[in-house]
């Protein structure tokens, strides 16, 4: 029985994103996306003029959803900024690994090196997404300086960019190692950089 959905464009994005998260962009053909979404080719091209433009829309959708999730984690009531930031980094460990220890979620990790030389629109979409993520982190760090949960360690945007790059690299190593050791090391480095106790 065909599943019911009202937004065909979003349905195609959701189905394609699920496959591409597992297989990468180049490893997924248009027919596989059409089959998963159970839509004809004409419907796809009504919304996306090419697979590349679909990829751009998919990444923009991913970033929008990711930022919404990020806002929830960083805005938990009853937590100071330091606690919220460490909860955010903890989510990387819990969500970056599936049962076999393989990255299964982050499209930034999955696609950055693949699409950077393949598609300028997709590269720009990912780059814009990382800028927006770093901006969210910078706001959280600045809030920590106001609520006294973080010391005045560095310029918030610079610290946010450094931490994000640290964790992104750790997530990429996690794919190679198939364990959480790189993420655990990133956590310890984050605590040191933010001058937080190890039990934070």
Question: Model-derived features: where do they sit?
Answer:
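Short, basic, alpha-helical segments at the C-terminal edge of helix-turn-helix-like DNA-binding modules
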Residues: 60-67
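Amphipathic alpha-helical segments used for helix-helix packing
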Residues: 84, 99-121
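Hydrophobic alpha-helical connector segments
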Residues: 57, 71-104, 156-163
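Helix-turn-helix
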Residues: 11, 15-53, 57-58
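C-terminal peripheral helix-coil segments that are non-catalytic and often amphipathic
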Residues: 2, 87-98, 131-147, 157, ...
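Short amphipathic alpha-helical segments with heptad-repeat character
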Residues: 120-123, 127, 131
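Short alpha-helical elements of helix-turn-helix
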Residues: 10, 14, 106-109
């Amino acid at each position: 029985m065909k599943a019911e959905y009202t937004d065909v464009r979003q349905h195609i994005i959701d189905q394609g994103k699920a496959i591409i998260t597992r297989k990468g962009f180049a490893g997924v053909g248009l027919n596989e996306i059409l089959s998963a979404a159970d839509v004809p080719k004409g419907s796809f091209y009504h919304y996306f003029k090419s697979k590349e433009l679909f990829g751009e829309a998919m990444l923009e959708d991913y970033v929008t959803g990711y930022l919404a999730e990020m806002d929830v984690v960083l805005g938990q009531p009853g937590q100071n900024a330091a606690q919220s930031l460490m909860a955010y980094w903890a989510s990387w460990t819990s969500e970056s690994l599936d049962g076999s220890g393989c990255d299964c979620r982050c499209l930034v990790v999955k696609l950055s090196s693949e699409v950077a030389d393949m598609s300028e629109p997709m590269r720009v979409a990912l780059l814009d997404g990382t800028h927006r993520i770093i901006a969210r982190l910078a706001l959280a760090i600045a809030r920590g300086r106001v609520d006294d949960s973080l010391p005045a360690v560095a310029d918030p945007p610079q610290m946010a960019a450094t931490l994000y790059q640290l964790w992104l690299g750790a997530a990429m190593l996690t794919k190679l190692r198939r364990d959480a050791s790189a993420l655990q090391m990133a956590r310890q480095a984050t605590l040191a950089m933010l001058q937080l106790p190890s039990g934070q």
